[in-house]
From Swiss-Prot:
InterPro entries (UniProt xref): Mt_escape_2_C, P-loop_NTPase, RBD_domain_sf, Yme2_C, Yme2_RRM
Protein name (record): Mitochondrial escape protein 2
Signal peptide (from-to): none
Mitochondrial intermembrane side: 293-808
Gene3D superfamilies with a match to the protein in the record: P-loop containing nucleotide triphosphate hydrolases
Regions that span the bilayer: 272-292
Cross-referenced CDD domains: RRM_Yme2p_like
Amino acid sequence: MFLSRSIPQAFSLRYTTRYGKLILRPGRRFVSSEIQQKDEQAGESNTATDTGIIHKTEQETLIYFDNVYPRAMSLWSPTQWYNLLMSNQTRNAVRAKIFKFANPPDNPIHNLELRSTIPIKRDGGVFATFLVPPNYTTAEVNAMIQKNTQQESSKSWFSFFTEVTAFPVKGSPWIEDLRRLPSNQIRVKFEGGFLTEEEVYALFRRYGTIINIYPNPKEMTYLISYRSFRGAICAKNCVSGMEVHNSIIHVQYEQLTQGHVISDFFVNHTRIAVPLLLALLSILAVIVFDPIREFTIEQKITHKYSLSWDNYFLKKILSVTSSTMSSVKEYWGITDRHVQKRQLWEERQEKVADLKLWLQENNNTFVVLRGPRGSGKHELVMQHTLHDRPNVLYLDCDKLIKSRTDAKFLRNAASQLGYFPIFPWVNSVTNLLDLAVQGLTGQKSGLSESKELQFRNMLSTAMMSIRHIALKGYKPVIGSGDSIINVKEEDYLQQHPEKKPVIVIDRFNNRAEMNGFVYKELSDWAAMLVQMNLAHVIFLTETVSPNQLLAESLPNQVFKMMTLSDASKKSARRYVLAQLQETTEDDDDIDTSKPLDLNEKFVHEIDDSLDPIGGRMLDLQAFVRRVKSGEQPKEALEKMVEQASEQITQIFLSGSADPLRGAQAWELIELLSANGSIRFRDIIYRPLFKAAPEAALLDLEKNGFVTMTRDRGVLTDIYPAKPLFCAAFQYLLNNKEMYNVLRTSYLLRMVTFETGRIKKWEEELRALGKVSDQKMFRSRLAYLAGKIDASSAAIDDCESEVKELSKK
């Protein structure tokens, strides 16, 4: 039995001299036989898989076949999965393949026997042990196997990639599964004498083209660089362990120590690398995420795949079903007991008709719908005008404006637009990276984006989605045969206004304490949509102030203006009675066990209740709900007045409110409760309003306390924000206990206000008292003294009134 040699474990040293030099000649002791004996004594396996050593007899020959498996170029090479997926890579299939290459029918080696195969999948090859037939020598068998393998593997059309080569193994190969990946360079170590470069070339050239040989006499090694991986792999597996001139050759792959090119580039060229990385990330984001975002925005507008009643296909089914049932009922003379719930008074019906007509005209559909808070602008547009339209996008500015953090703002904006996916946390990370890059390079990377820019990008993506929806059925060419008509996109949109989406922007204003840029961005975006004729845009606003902002975004254009006012008493009465006459079976929160009896007395009570309620849409709807739930009209009115008064006290008269604004609100309550309206010129001379009357009133109007009329931009009259507030003002004044508390709070605020004024004047008097010539400021001193006397008298009056109120 021939046992291949393993790595020497011990050396016995002998010393000789030659030409005056000391030469070390190691006396070698092989350890493989001892290891084999130990394994046999322990009853362990001696296979090549367990020991890394291939055993063969003198009657056997060992051949290495290359390019049988896909070789591993890295630790995570995906080509290795090919061995698991393909059936022709199994052990039996490989044995049959190798035997076919070595012993083909057209040039057989008689009585050739394949004893064993040992796959080396990392190197892509197989060690095969053949039994040499008696009529052949080992050299003859090796030569024939090499020739047959070369001829058989080259018959395939893909032989350039799949050709297999066979080489006799001259050494004692070491079968290891260490993490030493193949490379095109091998390190040859000599245990004993050092071969010449010519001898090394002659020994290793047969396995592949050698690019260069790098000798290292000090370490007794050669570095051989092959042109291909195959040459280095075959040389390593066939020559390693070979003995030449009493020198044992050890061959290992040389691991190429390549520098980290990418990391070095980033470290050494940050000013170029960082912008380049940002550009690549931006391109990747556009390629991957923008199509997804455009699709989600289209879904938000059309509801085509949404799981709701707005689903496109569900609407089609319901439309067909409803039409069919209506036809059947009409044929049998059956009428619906349910009255259509979309009740409007005549003025509102005309508004709805005008809006629908403007959307059909397709001529600069830029509508501004103005009305006080609670006038029903949202209901008029969304429920009565656009309820049957399949492509509507609703944006609520209030949710965007009130977002306190950048991440919350971006999430709210994305939610309203249907912009998905979005990564708000990236903004915080990029800010930190921007600071780090600025510290390294001295300049900003431009990685971080402001929320204004991100919001603008969202709107740009939404514009692309809107364009896709508007041009869904567009065909550039119409006709067949000789009659072909080219149709432009502009002409198609002009002829099909129903294809264009409707953008509804609610609670639009022109300024805000935070996130005020939203109004400007939405205004510019809407103007661009209208100019490109891609969509109809409807703005819902409470005041006339946004008109200037819209005019800046869309100059030289006349807006379609529509104003919603409170209903007249006649229209409000008709609306309420029509609502009360409806069957309430579909209302889950209303008790229908007690049907309403609309007798003359009941109608008279409703008429009396509608006087203080007025014609505000939301108040009328609240009144109807209360009456339907079982409350009497008078009781419903009282509760609504109490609720309105509570709202006023909590927002404007509570301790958390601004003291000055609270005092101004109470003064207006007393004036408006007596007259119903007051002129602006009667307010500007009052002490609380004298400093900035218009700013104070605008702030109260913004918070929904009062509403004002203007004549050519100048304030003229002041009214309560809604008619119900008049009754609430009267309630606050007539309730003695509440009146005493609120009046006392107002008087104390007046005392504080007048005291602050006196302190300011006293400081001026103190400064004037230091002047030597008092005659120069005699008139100013008299003026200040008069002011102080007047304020002191006002304080005395307030304090005396507080005492009187405390006694009640």
